[in-house]
Regions:
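Aromatic-glycine hotspot motif
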Residues: 1-184
Length: 184
């Protein structure tokens, strides 16, 4: 469980880094994250992408996440993004959804290349969401770390969440590269 101080720091960092940005800026930041993942995964073997890598702690990552593979990280990221898309749609319809316990997204089993198809399909839905939905709902959903978020705040969370895991994917691949270079 995070301390009050950690939660306040995370909230301030979120709102300064993403929450006060325009929808267009967050969309562009999300798109750059997808491009970065494409670049990181280019020409990396499936064996490496499905092999867990034990990485150093990073802000925003739970201890469980530190031992995931790239594919597991992508599966988790996609699951969270699908849930946020659903919450945004509910808020925009005038509903008041409940996010529930976010730790449920920390349980990811072994994953393979099949996760990429859904990940990229949902990423495209996220990139085009502002063209389809106004993101003006006044209704809110409570996030235990970031507080009360409307649909625009949730859209900002998509970009923030993606970049959190871009750095995780980069660290996993660097860990595998170090291991490979030691074996040579």
């Amino acid at each position: 469980m995070k301390s009050i101080i950690e939660i306040l720091i995370a909230r301030i960092a979120f709102w300064l880094g993403y929450g006060c940005r325009s929808i267009t800026t967050n969309r562009n930041q999300f798109s750059r994250g997808i491009q970065k993942i494409n670049m990181l995964l280019a020409e990396v073997s499936h064996d490496i992408l499905e092999t867990p890598g034990s990485i150093k702690p990073q802000p925003g990552l739970t201890p469980t996440m530190l031992n995931w593979s790239v594919y597991m990280t992508i599966e988790h990221t996609d699951q969270v993004h699908v849930e946020i898309l659903h919450l945004i749609e509910l808020l925009e319809r005038g509903e008041r959804p409940n996010l529930g316990d976010i730790s449920r997204f920390d349980t990811v089993g072994p994953a393979g290349p099949d996760v990429l198809k859904d990940f990229y399909k949902h990423a495209r839905q996220i990139e085009t969401l502002p063209d389809r939905i106004s993101l003006t709902s006044r209704n809110r959903v409570h996030h235990r770390i970031f507080g009360s978020l409307n649909s625009r705040g949730l859209y900002a969370a998509l970009a923030m969440h993606l970049w959190l895991h871009v750095s995780q994917i980069k660290a996993i691949l660097e860990k595998h590269a170090q291991k490979y270079s030691r074996e040579q």
